[in-house]
Structure formats: structure tokens, C-alpha cells
Amino acid sequence: MWILAIIYDKIDIGKSDILKTIKDFDLNNKKIIIRVDFNVPIKDSKILDDNRIVNSIETIKYAIDKGGKVILLSHLGRVKSEEDKVKNDLSIVVPRLSELLGINVKFCEYTRGSKLENMVSELNNGEVLLVQNTRYEDFPNKLESGNDLDLGNYWASLGDIFINDAFGTAHRAHASNVGIASNLDSGIGFLMEKELKVLNGVKDNPKKPYTVILGGAKVNDKIGVINALVEIADYILIGGGMSYTFLKAMDKNIGSSLLDSESIDYCKNLISKYRDKIILPIDNVVCNEISDEASSRSCSIEDIKEDEIGVDIGAKSVELFKKYLSNSKTVVWNGTMGCHEYDDFANGTKDILEFLSNIDCETIICGGDTASAAINFGYKDKFTHISTGGGASLELLEGKKLPGVEAIENK
């Protein structure tokens, strides 16, 4: 497959604006606020996937090596209650982060106040302080996600330089990205730079044939990106839960499968206009309930029963999709082919991952569940790029501006 060379320099992201990177700053003896993305999946107080932590290390180590005093900000999950605060305490990442950096990372359990300010003032060159989950500020008043001006200004007051390396939140205007960047000399980190270069390259000049794989649940969530990509892609292969809305729009029986009823008319119009581009499953795996104990069977789309739920694409659909993928030179994939978290319903996703890992093609995995599946199934190093941002990558490919980047462009 194609391997992209990433050159870390001032980055032209496809327009006249030039973004400064961390390498454009003198970091020695400076307090460097780095917005990272440590929004990792957690179960039973254990980190299930540390990919986002691992991807942040290059930027953090660079700041350490250049003599910076590093202050890390990140969110973890959503915080709408005191119980959410307990569940999403960011201190859980400290042991793994310390291990990866080879130093003892300090942690402040507060997002503001004298304790935080004192810990910042006591930092020595080359030391790292991780601040508590920025979304603690979302309860009860959504100050973080609402980009509260005072909060952004306060966090900015803690540092000398701001580096945004959290691509996964770049499509959001939050106090911890836009708010800080509006008040401080700012640039981007190595991860953000790589994400922008790779995804803008695909958006602006994809190698042809260009195939998009879309899965996941609701069509409505991806209408914008579908409208953008259907104009430039050669084929769009649709699997996962969203495929059943398209099949319903073609008057197919979908049993009790997931249906985005509000999007049926949209799907009808899209199929009518782009029938040769939109490729849908021809068979599926079905069951009566989604659980580890559920019995399942494979059947054609026409043979699904009223009480059955589609949970994966079938073997014939995999072979159909392979025909379009085999000649592709660019593949962008967002959304798994089925309920991949259950072993019996993961074969469609696994089979497509395996096939893509062995063809001569530029392959981009766009964040979220697809990235987690690729990593968990052992394909972490098999693709050109696995993005750390689901929504951010889709909005960039759609042609939208990313507020977290735009705030730095406009400095």
C-alpha cells in the first residue's frame, strides 16, 4: 500500500493560510499548554485502547526535550452529573502516560483554582502536568463545550504557548481549544499536522479509482459527508446499520433491522441519482436479539424474516465489495460493517480489514469504531493512516472548516 511521507514544517492545509507548528516556537523555559485527546475507551477501570495516548507522545516528548514546562489538557467522556465525574476521572491515564514518556507525570485533580495555579508555577523544565478532565467544567453549566470566554481566558493564563494536538475535537469550538487559542500564541502538534496533511490530500487530490466505505448506524448523521463524497468518489460501499435504510428505500424487506425512517426519502433520491455509484449488501447475518448468546444465520436480503435483525454483511456482500476495492487506489472507510463488538457479527468488518491490508492502495480509516476495530483486530500498522478523529475527519472531508484549526489560522 502507499505510505505517505509526512514532513514536519510549516503546514499549508490547502489554502493561503499557513499554520505554525510546535517546531516554530522556542519552548525552552516556557509553559506549553498542549490540548491532547485522551478520550480513551474504559471498562471496569481499565483502558481498553491506548491508541490516542500513544499518538500524543511525539508532541509531548518534543516539548519535554526542548525544555518546556508541559501542561496537558484533555476531556474524557461526557460529564452531565457528579456520577459522570467519578466515572470519567482523567487520572486513569497517568500510569500509562508516565510509562510511555519514561517520567512521572504530575496530576492536578482540579480544572481551576489555586491548587492548579501552584502546581503550574512549580513546574520545572521537562516536567509534565496533566490537568483533570476539561469536561468537569460542563457540569452544571457546559462551560467547556460551550466555549465559555472566561474559562478559555483562564486556561490561557496558565501558559506562554498553546499547541493544539487534539484532532478528534478539532470540529468542536470548546474553551480548551478555540478559547485558549483566541488568547495565546498558538500552533499545532505533530499528530494534528499529520491528520490535516493526510486528510486534506485525500479531499483535494485522491488517487483514482476512489472508493468510500460507509457503515455505522444512522444515515442522517452522515448526510453531509455523503453529499460531498458522492460527487468525487467512484464508488460508495454501504454496510452496517445504515445500509438497511437504503435497502428500505428500495422497497426491500429489512425485518426488524435498524431503520432511520427520517432519511428514507433522502436515500431514495440519492439512489435514483447515483445508482451506479452506490453499492449495497446482497446478503447479511441476522438474529432475533443482539447478544453474545444469540443464534444467527446468513441469508439473502430478500429472505430476512420480520422478527430478525441484520447485524453484519454476509459473505457474498464481502465478495461483492472486494470487487470494487480490488482496483481502487484510494479507500476511505468510516463505520463498521456490523456489530463488530460481538464475535459472531464481526466477520464482515474483519474480512474487509484483511482484504484492504493486502492491496496496493492508499487506505484511510476515519476514526471512531472503525479505528478501534482495526486496532483491536490486529491491523494497527496495516493502513496508510488510521485517524484519531471520527467526526472531525468526516467534517474535513465534507469540506467544512474545523473551529479548532481555524482559531489557530486566524492568529
Pin down the residues of each PLM region.
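Active-site loop-to-helix "anion-binding N-cap" substructures in soluble metabolic enzymes
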Residues: 4-411
